[in-house]
Amino acid sequence: MYSFMGGGLFCAIVGNILLVVSTATDYWMQYRLSGNYAHQGLWRYCMSNKCYMQTDSIAYWNATRAFMILSGMSCFAGIIAGIMSFAHFSSFERFNRSFAAGIMFFVSTFFVLLGMAIYTGVTINFLGRRFGDWRFSWSYILGWVAMLMTFFAGIFYICAYRMCECRRGTSPR
């Protein structure tokens, strides 16, 4: 049980770090504009070694930002619940923190999946046609890796919960 929780906690911490780095950096997409190399993230775009804030209030950027932030927050809440699941308090016997942590990691996975899917769909269908020579970059890829890490953290914590439930069911009362 503790090995599952330890593996889940490791995946969750790495996933949360990747979520923060992915959301905060400016390399979601790279392209050439007027012969110059440019790149953009969720908050800024950079051309000719100068970066500018994204001042346009475009719905897909706002949705992607919101889902990535919600994902990071729910992952952090899952990490707190996951750390608390190592301690056993008699007053919390009916509330299983391993299960709560697993659910929070799945919620985080869902939010990052929504954010990445929105960004991917709009980028391929709209921005991809606007810029001929473009590609997704490392910040974007970190978002997908973070999704996998939070998903596996959820799997590990749900497995730990199931092992705990099996032990409870077989122990004499």
Regions found by a protein language model. Give the residues of each.
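Signature of small four-pass
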Residues: 1-29, 61-123, 143-146, 150-164
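Intrinsically disordered cytoplasmic terminal tails of membrane proteins
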Residues: 163-173
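Short acidic-hydrophobic sequence patches enriched in Asp/Glu that either
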Residues: 38, 99, 134
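Juxtamembrane membrane-interface segments at transmembrane-helix boundaries in membrane proteins
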Residues: 1, 48-65, 127-143
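Secreted/luminal cysteine- and crosslink-motif detector
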Residues: 47, 52, 76, 165-167
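A surface-exposed beta-alpha-beta supersecondary segment
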Residues: 22-65
